[in-house]
Amino acid sequence: MKVGIVVFPGSNCDRDIFHVLTDVFDLEAEYFWHEKHLPSKIDAIILPGGFSYGDRLRAGVIAAHSPIISDVKSMAKKGVPVLGICNGFQILVESGLLPGVLLKNTTMNFMCKWINLIVQNNNTPFTNKLKQGQKIS
């Protein structure tokens, strides 16, 4: 399995992702700069976290218009799994690959607290070991 790691100006933890994929899961991984195109022989795509373009306008909005995103969209439509971590998730929302919008919190202050997640869909390569409705904390 070959995983493409998409890198933007301001991305971080892309090396951590590479390490986990190659050294822990023994998968093949390759970095792809946001101005390039993805080869057709990619089995999964990961958009790492960070602060793409310094989050100058909105988190992920500039990166969502990078040339590589059209490849990510077309590959996702063909069933290639795509994972967005932190800013990568924001890029997926801003690009329209995920539904919804990103909103500022009501206090307009930084918030750091633990939250619980509820598994809504366990029919994905990333959630298939979890149970529908399972609480992740």
Predicted regions: what is each one?
Residues 1-84, 92-114, 118, 131-134:
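N-terminal beta1-alpha1 cap of cysteine-dependent amidohydrolase-like domains
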Residues 87:
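A structural signal for conserved, well-ordered secondary-structure elements
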Residues 124-137:
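Catalytic core of tubulin tyrosine ligase-like
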